[in-house]
Structure formats: C-alpha cells, structure tokens
C-alpha cells in the first residue's frame, strides 16, 4: 500500500471529536498564538496514533476525570482527551485541568 493510501486509511479510522469548550480553546490558539496552536496540532496527531505514549508526558487522570488522559502543551496549559476506539474526544486544550 502506498503512503497516500495508508494516510487515507488512517484518516478514516481516526477521528477527533470536541466539546464546545475544547473547540473554543482550539480556536483561541489559532487566533492568538501560532506556536501553541502548532503544538496542540502536533499533540493531537500523536494522540491519534498512540493516545497513551509519546510527547507531552501523557498521564491518566483521576477522580472526576478518571478515564481521561492529559498531555502537557506548556507549563500552564494541558490537552485533556478521552481515548476512544475510533479516535479521541477532546475536552480541553487550554489552562490546567482542575
């Protein structure tokens, strides 16, 4: 299978879903900070490939967010997501979870 076909197959099998707040966070970075926006995109790509390992110090969350995972975007901001069979469900990509 050629590279283009592999990418197309992966795109169909991996999906991103967003909460309203997470999407607003994402648009905030798009408008206000290109560097962080690019980092978020990089982390999202990596989460789709392997939601439990990689950059950003992935860690499972506890308490009310049990089942969700977090990756560090910056010292202040985290990407918080729920790994699912067909992709990830993003609940935040701005500020620290609490």
Enumerate the language-model features and the residues they cover.
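Enriched for short, Lys/Arg-rich terminal
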Residues: 1-15, 21-24, 28-38, 42, ...
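Blade/loop signatures of beta-propeller domains
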Residues: 49-51
């Amino acid at each position: 299978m050629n590279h283009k076909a592999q990418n197309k197959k992966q795109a169909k099998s991996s999906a991103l879903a967003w909460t309203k707040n997470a999407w607003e966070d994402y648009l905030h970075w798009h408008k206000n900070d290109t560097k962080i926006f690019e980092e978020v995109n990089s982390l999202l790509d990596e989460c789709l490939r392997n939601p439990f390992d990689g950059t950003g110090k992935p860690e499972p969350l506890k308490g009310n967010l049990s089942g969700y995972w977090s990756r560090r975007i910056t010292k202040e901001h985290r990407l918080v997501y729920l790994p699912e069979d067909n992709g990830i469900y993003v609940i935040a990509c701005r500020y620290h979870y609490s």
